[in-house]
Amino acid sequence: LPPSGRGAMYVRPLLMGSGPILGVAPAPSYRFLVYVTPVGPYFKGGVTAIDLLISEEHHRAAPGGSGGVKAIGNYAPGMMPSKKAKSKGYAEVIYLDAETHTCIEEVGAANFFCVKDGVLYTPELTGTILPGITRDSLIKLARHNGIEVIETRVTAEFAMSADEAFCCGTAAVISPIGSITKGETKAEYGEGEPGELTTKLY
C-alpha cells in the first residue's frame, strides 16, 4: 500500500463476455477480473486546482441510454473531446446534458460539485450520470457534518457563478477546480487555490 497522503490503492473490477460467439448477442460465459495497483494523483500536480473546458459539441450520454452504467462504451467516446481539451491546456472536459445543452452532467469520468453560499450542489441522477461511489460518500459525509447538499439540475451558468467547484471519482478522489471555460467566458474560483469546503471534504 502507498504511504498515507502520497497515493492510494486502486481496485478495478472488470467483467467481460467470452465464448464461441461472434454475433451481437449476450455472451454464453463471462470472465471476472480484478486489477489492483498503487496510484498517485489522477491529475498532474496532485491536489492543485485544475482548469476545465465545457464541451459545446460533444455529449457523454443521452436520455434513455446507458449513461448511468459503468461500461467502456461510456468512456471511449470521451477520449477525443478529452484529447482536444488537453491540447488546449485544460485538464479535462465538462459535459452538458444532450437534451437542453445547459446543465452540467460530468467531468470526463468524474462527478461534479460546486459550492454557493455554503451550500453544496451536485447534478441529480437522471439516468445519464454515473452514480459514483465517491459522489455518494461525499454527499453522506457532507450531510453528516451539517453541510446542506442539494441534488438538482446544475446549469453551466449557475456553476460558473459559484464560490468554488470540484470533481470527484475513484481515481480523481477530490480534485479542486480552478477555472471553467465556456466559449469566450471564463469563471475562476479561489484565485486558483482549493476552496474552503473542498479542502474540508478532502
Region locations from a protein language model:
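Non-catalytic accessory segments adjacent to catalytic cores
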Residues: 1-9
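Helix-start/capping segments and mature chain N-termini
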Residues: 1, 14-17, 21-202
